[in-house]
Structure formats: C-alpha cells, structure tokens
Amino acid sequence: MTTLDHVIATHQSEWVSFSEEPLFPTPLEGGTEEHFPGLSSSSERSESSSGENHVVDEGSQDLSHSEQDDSSEKMGLISEAASPPGSPVQPTPDLASAISNWVQFEDDTPWSSTSPPHKETALTLTMPCWTCPSFDSLRRCPLTSESSWTTHSEDTSSPSVAPSYTDLQLINTEEQASGRASGTDSTDNSSSLQEDEEVEMEAISWWAGSPAMNGHPAAPPVTTARFPSWVTFEDNEVGCPSPPVPSPKKPNTPSAATAAPDVPFNSTGSFKRDRPKSTLMNLPKVQKLDISSLNRPPSVIEAPPWRATNPFLNETLQDVQPSPINPFSAFFEEQERRSQNSSVSSTTGKSQRDSLIVVYQDAISFDDSGKSQPHPDAIEKLKQLQIDDPDPVGNTALPDDDPTASVELDAPSPASALSQPRDGWPMMLRIPEKKNIMSSRHWGPIYIKLTASGYLQLYYEQGLEKPFREFKLEICHEVSEPRLQNYDENGRIHSLRIDRVTYKEKKKYQPKPAVAHAAEREQVIKLGTTNYDDFRSFIHAVQDRLMDLPVLSMDLSTVGLNYLEEEITVDVRDEFSGTVGKGDNQILQHHVLTRIHILSFLSGLAECRLGLNDILIKGNEIVSRQDIMPTTTTKWIKLHECRFHGCVDEDVFNSSRVILFNPLDACRFELMRFRTVFAEKTLPFTLRTAASINGAEVEVQSWLRMSPGFSSNRDPLTQVPCENVMVRYPVPSEWVKNFRRDSVLGEKSLKAKVNRGASFGSAGASGSEPVMRVTLGTAKYEHAFNSIVWRINRLPDKNSASGHPHCFFCHLELGSDREVPSRFANYVNVEFSMPTTSASKAAVRSVSVEDKPDVRKWVNYSAHYSYKVEIEQKKSLKPDFEGEDLENPKECGVQ
C-alpha cells in the first residue's frame, strides 16, 4: 500500500526534475506574476535539495517508536508555542495536515480562512513523513517550510489547520504592546524588507528556525558547517532579501514557536496587491515607532499638525467686498458644497483621520474666516453676473465696436486739402523723357491738368488752351514711390514717375528652383517739384483717378493663361494725418484712411472673396478653414465712407459685408478704401517743441521720447520701430542764408550730427556763430521742404533704451530784430512709416478663391504717419519743461 509520504515524495521528485522545460514558467525579476511570486526561488532550492529529500524519505520508513514519541513531544512544543499566551490551549496539529495547508495559497481568496475550528483531541504523529522524520534530520532541513514549497501545487483539497489570520493579529497586537529585547537582532534584515515588494516564505522560515540567531537552546542549533549550503540557496533567489522575523518575548520559549505563525504570514505577504494590510510585518520594531498612533487622532502635545497656508489670502483684506467683475457663479456653489462637506466630515470622521486627511483639511481651512462674515448683497449680485462679450456692443470706450453708434469723424480732415480737386499743378518735367548717352537731361517747368476722363494734359505755361502733350491713364499704370533727387545748387527736388507695369512669371534656379512674378516697368513720364504740398496733392489726385477707371472687357489672350504658381497678394496700408496739441501731446484732430491693393496671378476667371474685421459681421462669418488668414488683433472696427474699385460687387457688400470681386490679371490695383477711427490712444512717440525769440536771438528745442501707451512699445521683444522719421522745422526765407556756407563746389547746407554741432553763417555778419545740435540722427536745412529737417533712420535707436529721450537744439543770432518775421510758424511737421502695423486695426480675416484651394495667399500691413505738432512759445528755453534751472539751458545733453 502506497503511503501518503511516498506519494508526496514521488510527486515532488517529478516536479523538481532537472529537465530543460520546467513545469511552470519561472517569472523574471520585476515580473507581473500574481499567484506565484516566489515560485522561481523555491523551485530552484527544491531542485538542489531533491536528492536529499529522497534519502530522508527512505529513512523515515524505518523510524522507531521511540523516535516518533520524541518527535511528538517536540511537535507539541511547536503547537504550544503557536498559540498566543493567555489563549485556550490549542491541540497539536497533524504535521501532514499542516503541510497540505499550504495548498490554500493558490485560492482566489487568500485572506478568507476556510479551515474548520480546531478540535479538542489532537492527532498524534503516528504516520511517518518524509518532510520531518526526526529533529535530528531537521539539522539538515531546519523547518518543514523549506521543503514544503515543493508540494504546494500537488494537493489542494486538504483543509487548513494552521493558525488563522485573526490569531496572527492577536499575536502581533500583543507583540506590539510588549517591549522586545531581541528587536535589534532583526534590524538589518528588516531594512531589506522595505526595499522588496515580494516576501519570500523560505527566507523568513529559515531565519525564524535558527536558534543560534536568537540564542534559544530549545531546538538543535544550525551548525556552521551547514551554513554555506543555505547561502547557495540564497544565491539562487532572484533578488529576494531576507525579511525580519519577530522574536519571542520570553527567553524560555523556543524560537521554533515562531514558525507556525510565520507560515501563513509569509504566504499572504507574497501577494503584491495586498501589501496595504501590512500590520503583520512588525515595522515598529525597526523604526522604534508606535504603529497604533496611526489609528489615533493627532495629538497637539506630540507634534503640532502642519497647517497649509493660503498664499492668496491676505488677512488684512478680510473686510473687503468681493470684486463685482467676477463672472463665475459656480465658485459660490463650490464654496457652499465644501463648507457642508467639511462640517460633516469634521464631526463624523474625526477618529478615522490619518495624516493625509489632516493636511487636506488644514489646507482648505482658510475659507472658514471668509464664510463666517458673508456679504449677502454683493454675493447675490455676483451670482447674477453673466459672461459677456469681451467687446460689448455699446461700449463707449470702443466707438468702432458699436454698429449702432454714429461716430462723428473729424471734419474737415487735415488731408482733405490734399484731395480737393484742383485745376492743375505747376510741375517740372524731366527732359528728355528717356535717357540718352549723347545728351544730358534737365528739368523744365510745365503745367499739368488732370481731366475727369483720366487724361493728363501737359502745358508749357498756365493759361494755354492747347496742351503740347496728352496721354490717358490706364489700369496698368502705377505711381512710383516719392524720392528726393538733385536739382540745383540750392538743393534737391521731389520726383515721381508714372510707369506702365507688367508682371511676368519667371523661373529661378539659384539658390534653389523657384517661381517668381517679376515686374517690368516702362517709364511713361517723370515729374518733380520743390513744393511739397503740391507734390502730395498731385499724387493723391492721380491715385484717385486710377481707382475710378472703368473696368474694360476681359482680355481673352490672358484668360487661358496658366500660371505655374497661383497666388494673390493683399496690401493693407493705413495713412494717418492729424494735429497734436502742445504739452500733453493730445490728438486734437485725426484722419485715418485705409487703402487695400490687390495683385493676383490666377489662371482663368476666378471669383474672390475678402473678409475684414467688420463689426457688422461679427459672429456671422462663414468661411472655409483653408481661407482663414492669421491676424494679430481681436478688435472689430466700423468702416466709414467706403469706396470700391469697378470690379467689386457693391450690392453683395451692402447685403453681406463681404467684398466679392473679380481681380484684374497680373495688375496691381486699389480694391477699396475706407475711413476708420484711430485705434490707439497715443502716437508711437511724443514730441514737445518750444521756441523762444528775444530780440535778435532765436532758440528752438525739441524733446522726443517713445510713448509707453502705444501698443507696439509695451513689449520690447515685439516692438515695431518707426522708420525714416522726419521732424521738419519751418524756416523763414530771410533766415536761409544763415544755414548755408560757401565751399569749393558751391554753397552747402550745414549739417549737424551726433556729438558734433554745426556752425552757421559767418562771424562777421551775425557777430557770433549759431549752434545746432542733435543727440540722435542728423539735422540740416533742406530746400525741398524749406525747413530744418531732423532725420532719424530708426526709433527707438538700437544703441539706446526705449524710454531714453532725444533732443534737438538750435540757437540762432540774427543781425537785428528786424529780421524776425511778423508771423512765425506754429507747427512742426512729423512724418514716418511703420511696417507690419496698422493704425486702424483693420485686418484681413479671410481670402477665398473660387474652386482654387491651393492658391498661395499673402497679406502685408503698413502704416504711414504725417501730422503736425504745436510749438510752445516761451520767453526763455530750458531743457526741462518743469522749470528746473540748469547751468547751460541752451544745449542738449549728449547721449
């Protein structure tokens, strides 16, 4: 008859066979095996000790009766030590049944104890067992748990006879309450338990069954000769250090008594997911802390609780009313909910509060002071607030955003005089019209008229009936940029050209292949004048006439033209003109005109749509995603006095506020123009000018500084500079000779530069040399403007701070006071340009081309400023307008 120990040994030997393919896969280190975390290490130890177990099995069959009685007595010690002190005497369990108790480790509910209550009559150890033949053989195998891991997967039907989880809690509770002298013995081993997530039963049982470690002679000690064999077992484990083992309280209690409670403890500790229930691990022995303090409310005497301070709460402002602009009504609902939850949790769950809950309740306790003194009226008012549009309709601060408000534009505008129709302009004609190597070119005086039908008529003199030349303006004509050109010994002349421009598509191969649309210009006429006002008036008249030209029938020769690169370019240019008051630089009058030019290269007939940030279509835009253009402003404006090119469908614009047009092919034309209100509160820079005339002594001084209120100047990283700045000081014709001097090549205008003053006239004529100085740029008299022109290429300067002031100073001593005119100029003229900016905040929000989604689209912005600044009349000049006396008030501080 086959005995139970023989069957177990046979199955164990098969399970630990040295085959290449193990029965169960060994999990790697850090693996995710849940039910067999320690299977790898235990199987390796069982393989190394399988031969020894067979010898023990054969010797156990010849066990004498005396040895069985001896073993029964010793097993009684084990079961007697397994029961806690003061508890009812537990019977001695059958060791074979205790072995089969390990099978319950694989159940789905490892923490539930399904074992029946212990019987009063204990069975004696009459059946020999291969795992524990005698305590003599235990010297080679200190505990049954060392080899019992080899049979835990063979039989799963035996009931559990080991101490239950409740018994273990009673043992640990008494161990926590009593001070143990042997707690320091397991300090090193317990420190390694905190670093490992898996608790190995074999390692715990080995240390618990070692009487030499705790010094208890009840069980036979492990000899030093057998200690290296256990080290080899530890080397085979996959990084599982030995955890701590609680030591018994009484010195006469054998150390093997801890093996019985440690067996189920280790089996439950091997589950990673159940680690929060770690009260069985006796951590307080290592950390010298009372673990029961976690279950008690925090005591003020032991350690004051940490209180989280609110960095946004100022206790001095507790009586301040809440801000009425807070639109979040949900904030108050959250506050009420928190107050209710905190009051309930403070009364019911105070005893169950751990350290984290204490910190959380302290962190939200700063709201209690504000809730104790509420403001019912203000809170009710805040609860009724709604989130409004950031640009509300009817806001007086933003007149353009109100479509119903009637904004009165400044009238008459400063630029109205330039756009007024005139009979003609005295101009200079460049003769001959084309360059010739054999002849020189010169300027000849003529008189020009512009007819309503778009004809330019050239007369030799004003009043003649028949022009000597006449030509018609065409849609392909463009007016060139104004420039200054040498004229005579007095100075330069303002010149412009009217060109016939054609655009052609060209391929470029350097530096990389690309397609470009180059412009070819053919000069039609070149004109010039020394009167700057006539010059600007003529330019405006020609631009108005080009825009009003009728659109002729489409040229069929260009309809079928296919472009390699289809593109459309939109140029938005703002022209600001106005008058600025003295002192605080307040804008007294202004006029903003926006011009939109189109240049397109589209194959065939194409219908285009252009959408602006018009306040009347706010919220009603319907455009495709690929047609949306990026903008840098969220402002909505109102358009005034709109004028359109002949290719625009005005009926569609009046109904939908969308510009629908058929663009001219390869021709730059003005699509539309409109007036708006200036979008800024201040100009890019402030200029204050003061003049003093005392007898024959004249002084003029200006201070220039960048304005911090201008939107572009707020961020130095995104600041847009002012380019080609001109500040013109009108000079009477009687004073011109004082600003010129003789040279080898004729008369020259004196020029003042940075850190270098300019001397005017001769000492014999005026008695002393006048001085003109600047701290930035250059200053000299220019005959084309009849003014002293202070020129600055760029503001702010690259080598100076943005808020650094710049100064112009001029001191002139006349021969007598009779040279002082009866009327002196009251304004200085300022003119400059700003790229990539907009004075009106007009923005192109969408550009769409019908049935052409792959068209390249470009939008360019620029602004041109031209305004007048009043001159302050003073008895004496001082660099500081606040009245501080300086040692030398006539000179500027050099930067």
Swiss-Prot record:
Short name of one Pfam family: Stonin2_N
Start-end of Basic and acidic residues biased regions: 64-73
Compartments (UniProt record): Cytoplasm; Membrane; Synapse, Synaptosome
Ranges of biased composition (kind: Pro residues): 241-251
InterPro entries on file: Adaptor_comp_med_subunit, AP2_Mu_C_sf, MHD, SHD_dom, STON2_MHD, Stonin, Stonin2_N
PTM characteristics: Phosphorylated in vitro by PKD. Neddylated; deneddylated via its interaction with the COP9 signalosome (CSN) complex through TOR1A and COPS4.
Modified residues (Phosphoserine): S278, S299, S759
Location of the SHD domain: 424-557
Feature: compositional bias, Polar residues: 145-193
Entry GO terms, CC: clathrin-coated vesicle; cytosol; membrane; neuron projection; nucleolus; synaptic vesicle
Keyword line: Cytoplasm, Endocytosis, Membrane, Phosphoprotein, Repeat, Synapse, Synaptosome, Ubl conjugation
Segments for region (Disordered): 15-119, 145-222, 234-280, 386-421
Motif residue range(s): NPF 1: 310-312
Superkingdom as given in the UniProt entry: Eukaryota
Family, similarity comment: Belongs to the Stoned B family.
Domain notes: The Asn-Pro-Phe (NPF) motifs, which are found in proteins involved in the endocytic pathway, mediate the interaction with the EH domain of SYT1, SYT2, EPS15, EPS15R and ITSN1.
Record note on quaternary structure: Interacts with the second C2 domain of synaptotagmins SYT1 and SYT2. Interacts with EPS15, EPS15R and ITSN1. Interacts indirectly with the AP-2 adapter complex. Interacts with TOR1A and COPS4; the interaction controls STON2 protein stability.
UniProt function note: Adapter protein involved in endocytic machinery. Involved in the synaptic vesicle recycling. May facilitate clathrin-coated vesicle uncoating.
Protein name: Stonin-2
Organism this protein belongs to: Mus musculus (Mouse)
Taxonomic lineage of the native organism: Eukaryota, Metazoa, Chordata, Craniata, Vertebrata
